[in-house]
C-alpha cells in the first residue's frame, strides 16, 4: 500500500494589493513511500492507542502516561529503532517521538505493539508545531535530534532545523538541567550546530573542551552508523544543558 499522506497544498496566489501570508521554511520534505504489512499494522492498530494529535493547548502528559516520570522527546525518529531501544531499556521513563514520514511512524508503532511498550507516544506531524502547541514550557528532561537532514547545499542551509530560533524554542520546553542532545554524521553540520548552540542564551556545553562529547552510552548505534564507521565516517554528538 502506498503512503497517502501528502504535503499541504501550495498557498493560493495573492490578489493584487493583497499581502501574502507568511510561510515558515520547513526543515523536511514529505516523501511518498510504500508501506509494509507491519508498518500498516502499526498505523491501523497502534495509532489509536499510542498516536497523538496536535492540540491548541499544552498536553498533560502525566495524564496521557498515567504517571509522572522523566520525559524525553525525539524529533525525527526515522524508523524508530533508537527510540524503541531506549524506551525498552528505560521503562521508568516516558518517550515522545515525532516523525512526519508514515512508513517510519508505522514501523515505530508496530514496534511498540510487538514489544508491548507502554511508555511511548507518537506524533506524525511537524515537530515545530508539536513544540509550539502541545509541549508545556519547562516540562522536558531531554530533547533528542539524531542525524537530521544536513541540507548540504549552501542555498538550503536555511532549511536546517538547528537555528537560533529553534535553540530558543527547545530551551523554553526543557526543564532547568534538561539536555538538548544532537548527533550528526556530517562534519560541516556538526560545526554549524556547535556554532549556533555555543552562542544560544541559557545553555552550557557539557563537553569538557566545549566542543563535542564522546558518544553517550544511552544513544544506540544504528546499522547506518556502523556502516559509516567501517568506511571511516565520523559521528559527532553535542549535548547542551539548559542552565536558566
From Swiss-Prot:
GO CC terms, sorted: tRNA methyltransferase complex
Q: In which pathway does it act?
A: tRNA modification; N(7)-methylguanine-tRNA biosynthesis
- Name the record gives this protein: tRNA (guanine-N(7)-)-methyltransferase
Q: Name one Pfam family in it.
A: Methyltransf_4
Q: Which UniProt keywords apply?
A: Methyltransferase, S-adenosyl-L-methionine, Transferase, tRNA processing
Q: What does this protein do?
A: Catalyzes the formation of N(7)-methylguanine at position 46 (m7G46) in tRNA.
Q: Where is the composition biased (Pro residues)?
A: 1-11
Entry-linked HAMAP family? tRNA_methyltr_TrmB (MF_01057)
Task: Give the main EC class.
Answer: transferase
Enumerate the active-site residues: 149
According to the record, the signal peptide region is none
Family matches, as InterPro entries:
SAM-dependent_MTases_sf, tRNA_(Gua-N-7)_MeTrfase_Trmb, tRNA_methyltr_TrmB_bact
Q: Which domain of life is it from?
A: Bacteria
Its source organism is: Pseudomonas syringae pv. tomato (strain ATCC BAA-871 / DC3000)
